[in-house]
Amino acid sequence: MANRPQALKIHPQPVLAPGELDSVRRQLAAASAQERVRWGLARFPGRIVLASSFGAQAAVSLHLVTREQPDIPVVLVDTGYLFPETYRFVDELTERLGLNLQVARPAHSAAWQEARFGRLWEQGVEGIERYNRMNKVEPMQQALETLGADAWFAGLRRQQAHSRQQRQVVEIQNDRVKVHPIIDWTDRDVHRYLTRHDLPYHPLWHEGYVSIGDVHTTRRLADGMSEEETRFFGLRRECGLHDLV
């Protein structure tokens, strides 16, 4: 059952000791995705969560992490504008994998925001950035605070976009550690994992959607388009969640 984030017990200690980041990166660069997950869980017991948009290939990270810790909080940011297929996909995977789903939502509903600000996603780059800040960045920040998370897993991959090619397996942002267990996986690696474990792609994947976010800012991949152009009218690739949180 989906819940609002519930507070966890916090065990204060340094996120990473001085000079530890470089050695951890070297250690995990040669490790498997499963070993990277185990490192994160061991290094931050009770203080690490998994973020998921329940996008095209989300089942990989959800399965990979929860097979090691079934009750890890899984944070979904619900903007109120997800595809109907996404909500059903959330329900399907939550039931199948027994997820400890924690749903983070904006301070104001979609209808309230439209009444107050209009359709921000139609107001150019500035409007899109404001929309993403209110509906994605701020809810995620609040969820991490509420859950007492010093670290979080994310399913980013370098192959997904030019903006992700310099991402590291472990990063520090805003005094929190981000762990990317499948950062160096290819599309073929993802497909093999899904096939091996009989896991589904997002339903819209089979209709030509390769990157799936909100209804109003997601398009099918067409001939001549890059994956980046399927989001936010090609004005930007990232929603800001992985840059600002």
UniProtKB/Swiss-Prot annotation:
SUPFAM superfamilies: Adenine nucleotide alpha hydrolases-like
Reaction catalyzed: [thioredoxin]-disulfide + sulfite + adenosine 3',5'-bisphosphate + 2 H(+) = [thioredoxin]-dithiol + 3'-phosphoadenylyl sulfate
GO BP: any one term: hydrogen sulfide biosynthetic process
InterPro entries membership: PAPS/APS_Rdtase (IPR004511), PAPS_reduct_dom (IPR002500), PAPS_reductase_CysH (IPR011800), Rossmann-like_a/b/a_fold (IPR014729)
Enzyme class, broadest EC rank: oxidoreductase
Keyword Cytoplasm: yes
One GO location term (cellular component): cytoplasm
Primary location class: cytoplasm
A GO MF label: phosphoadenylyl-sulfate reductase (thioredoxin) activity
Compartments it resides in: Cytoplasm
E.C. no: 1.8.4.8
Catalytic residues, chain numbering: 239
Pathway: Sulfur metabolism; hydrogen sulfide biosynthesis; sulfite from sulfate: step 3/3
Listed Gene3D superfamilies: HUPs
Superkingdom to which the source organism belongs: Bacteria
Keyword field: Cytoplasm, Oxidoreductase
PANTHER family linked: PHOSPHOADENOSINE PHOSPHOSULFATE REDUCTASE
Chain's role: Catalyzes the formation of sulfite from phosphoadenosine 5'-phosphosulfate (PAPS) using thioredoxin as an electron donor.
Family membership noted in the UniProt record: Belongs to the PAPS reductase family. CysH subfamily.
NCBIfam families reported for this sequence: cysH (TIGR00434), PAPS_reductase (TIGR02057), PRK02090.1 (NF002537)
Protein name: Phosphoadenosine 5'-phosphosulfate reductase
Gene that encodes it: cysH
